[in-house]
């Protein structure tokens, strides 16, 4: 068995250089411009991921840094709604009591605890009422529940 003694930093250098170049070359965008480039509001979907109590306001993993995003995200999504966007999805951490993820992060956002619900400031907005609601018991909403 061969052991790779190369440090993580050394193995990651090429990717980090790429990422640095990518972020430095990003161009500003407007919501209207993005909607237009999608062929109109029918070609746009807006997705909220994990802006739930357990990460924003209460619980072991809540952080004021994430909580400060609630208002600006809500305002952006309201602007999308005003521009005619009607496809919204809300992806929420909502773990079973024995979620494997708890081994790494400790219990958080347990289904039914209140920590798993969309922040109230967002939940009462028009776009949130009919949004596709996706609860997830995994880091990714696209991975098998587990």
Question: What kind of feature is each model-predicted range?
Answer:
Residues 2-134:
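Active-site acidic carboxylates
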Residues 133-146:
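Glycine-rich phosphate- or other oxyanion-binding loops that anchor nucleotides, phosphorylated ligands
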